[in-house]
Regions:
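N-proximal short alpha-helices
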Residues: 10, 39-43, 83
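Negatively charged, low-complexity tracts enriched in Asp/Glu with abundant Ser/Thr
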Residues: 1-29, 84
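Short, intrinsically disordered/low-complexity patches at protein termini
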Residues: 42-43, 69-70, 79-81
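A short, charged, amphipathic alpha-helix used as a generic interaction element across diverse proteins
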Residues: 61-75
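Intrinsically disordered, low-complexity charged/polar segments
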Residues: 76-86
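Conserved aromatic
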Residues: 1, 60-61
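Short aromatic-glycine-(Arg/Gly/Cys) micro-motifs in beta-strand/loop hairpins
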Residues: 28-55, 73
């Protein structure tokens, strides 16, 4: 079961540009397009944000599922992350 802390370590290990994601943080625009994970409605929410507009939003009941979804999204630009999805 992956946690946000473990996800953060994986992304750091693979030098994923921090402008591509936001994990449990509320900060000004990170990048033009980025993936944001935060708590919402008793679970977790993952949003794709483009120019400060949410263009996609998914809700997950558990932390591990939300983390896996973030990895899947970031794997488009960082294919080495796919190893954590198997």
């Amino acid at each position: 079961m992956m946690t946000v802390q473990e996800l953060r370590k994986i992304l750091s290990k693979h030098h994923v540009d921090t402008s591509f994601y936001s994990l449990m943080e509320h900060r000004p625009m990170v990048g033009e397009v980025y993936t944001a994970l935060d708590k919402a409605d008793g679970g977790y929410r993952v949003r794709t944000i483009e120019r400060m507009q949410t263009i996609e939003e998914k809700h997950f009941g558990d932390e591990a599922a939300a983390c896996r979804y973030v990895l899947k999204e970031l794997a488009y630009d960082y294919p080495e992350l796919k190893a954590y999805l198997d």
